[in-house]
Amino acid sequence: MSQSAFFKFSYNKLHHHIPLLFPNYLSIAPPLLRTTAAVRSNAAPDPPLGFLGAADVIVVGAGVAGSALAYTLAKDGRRVHVIERDLREPDRIVGELLQPGGYLKLIELGLEDCVDQIDAQRVLGYVLFMDGKKTKLPYPLEKFHAEVAGRSFHNGRFVQMMREKAAALQFVRMEQGTVTSLLEQDNKNVVGVQYRTKDGQQLKAYAPLTVICDGCFSNLRRSLCHPKAQFGDVMKSGRFDLSVCTSLLESPNMFLATCQVEVPSSFVGLVLENCQLPFENYGHVILADPSPILFYRISSTEVRCLVDIPGPKVPLVRSGMANYLKATVASQIPPELKDAFLSAIDRGNIRIMPNSSMPAEPYHTPGALLIGDAFNMRHPLTGGGMTVALSDIVLLRDLIKPVGDLNDASSLCRYLESFYILRKPMASTINTLAGALYKVFSVSPDDARKELRQACFDYLSLGKIFSGGPIALLSGLNPYPLSLVLHFFAVAFYGVGRLLLPFPSFERMWVGARIVLCAFGIIFPIIKAEGIRQMFLPTSIPAFYRAPPLR
């Protein structure tokens, strides 16, 4: 046996037996053992290695967020072990439009070439259609380089390019497997993950920091929320009786630690082939009844159509979906796209995706971090998800870069509390705008909501700052929550002014008052969920000023 083979054999045996003989070894072992890459629960062949030895960071999920994080941390010299459930090319109907603000973050990460060879299409803004009228809303890109614009593409092609670029780095080990649970030390610190490989073997992986970014259907989200901690505290107190059960039912956030996912609607996805958009290089938003319809190009020959269906129930694809699309939706499609839309329905391949929304409610867990859609979701109407995720990756990279030793979990956790505050300008602006616009653009029988919807379209049609300001917010180019609130209420008061002029009446004054109340009722719950203080007064929070732990 060669010297290298003997060392590898001894290394694997050592890490197999130490946990069995000394269950608490993680608390006393040196950093190399605490961050061991894999402790085998049975005799299994080694996974493909991008590097030998211990990992500094485990990344769960290799989507947009996970791949970008692995790449940027590895470029900084961190050893990253990526565990992804399925390394085949994803086939999704969302995550296909990257806003200009997100493209700027790609440039910061050095990943802008990932959109160069996938037939990605430049996006220069939006066109709104409503009741036979249309208005063009270009992105305010005058101050940026000519290459800066939005991009639309096949999500799977984009993700595969990012995975390939990350996996090519020496310090990235990318492995296919399903993470089933987080490994905890003393029910306090997360020290790694347990996962199942594609051939069914159960393995454990250890690292000082585990970053969960396994998407909107994350099965680890609740693990970081620790609902059993709340429940366990009640059990230990001896006060578990009927009144406690009632309070848990009445206040589920206490039990579920605020990890609630709302599904306000679903997208029905189609691909239109070999057709021309009325305005090339623009996203098309039809303000239809009952809710918006989107069109945007995802390749030189394909146009994505997303039909929003509000509520938790949608017609079944096999029985009623085609009839619904032809009877209810087709008549509201622009004439230039109607034939291609009907042809796409006849071809089949109709896809449905629930539109999830979840405000970010962090539970600070030493050794673990939640990012991407696993951490924070908003309605995909505005296409802001990837922009928020990439912005978070840039911020997290900059925060971790000066940290020399990741093994001090409690100090690192306390320092990374600043992440949740510093991300708020970009994330809360896009999240709030997405939720508010969806509610404003959806049809309602209420007169005040109808007036607010019409006022929003007419306000954006004014052009200049009235369209440029909101579009800069939506695109991630101007992440200022206060600017968002000012524009939103400017729309409301614009609607009131139109209603009262030239001759106000008592009835119109009443509707005008209800418009303002309606606007407040739409935006305030979203802002409250995001955190009023975090959005508008982040510098008043001590975590904003956290310094990195001493080396």
Describe the residue ranges of each PLM region.
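FAD/FMN-dependent oxidoreductases across multiple families
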Residues: 35-36, 246, 313-420
